[in-house]
Amino acid sequence: MYSPIFLRTENQLNKLLKSQRKSRKDWGILFVSLWDDASKTLVETINSKLSTDEEKSKPLYIVDSFKMPHAFVIFKTTKIPHLIQFKRGGLESEDYLSKVYEELGL
C-alpha cells in the first residue's frame, strides 16, 4: 500500500533519487498531468482511497508535469500517467492505465 506525497520542486525529486542510490528503499513515483482527465481521476482516487497514516505504507511521490516538466526526461516518460516503482531488486515502469491502478491497489 502506498501513501501519497505531492512534490512541488524538481530539487525535491533529485534529493529523493540521490538518497535512493544509498538506501534502496521501496517507494514509487507517479507522473501525471492535471490537464489530463485520466490523470485527474487517478489523483482523486488516490486521495480518497490511499491512506497517509499507515506506518507500513510506502511513499508514492506524485509529480505534476505542469510544475516539473524536466523531471519527465529522467525516466523517458512519454505517456501519462506513468508509475515508476523502486524495489530492492530494481526498477519497474508501468504506463498502461489499468496496470497503474492494479499496481497501486485501487
Language-model features: where?
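Short acidic-hydrophobic, aromatic-tinged amphipathic segments that line or gate anion-handling sites
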Residues: 2-17, 95-96
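CheY-like receiver
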Residues: 16-20, 71
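Short active-site neighborhood of thiol/selenol oxidoreductases, capturing the structured segment around
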Residues: 20-34
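Proline-centered helix-kink/hinge sites
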Residues: 26, 44, 81-84
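Residues at alpha-helix caps and immediate loop-helix transition turns in enzyme cores, especially N-
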Residues: 41-42, 96
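A short glycine-leucine-enriched loop at secondary-structure breakpoints
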Residues: 73-78
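Non-catalytic, surface beta->alpha helical segment in thiol-disulfide oxidoreductase systems
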Residues: 79-106
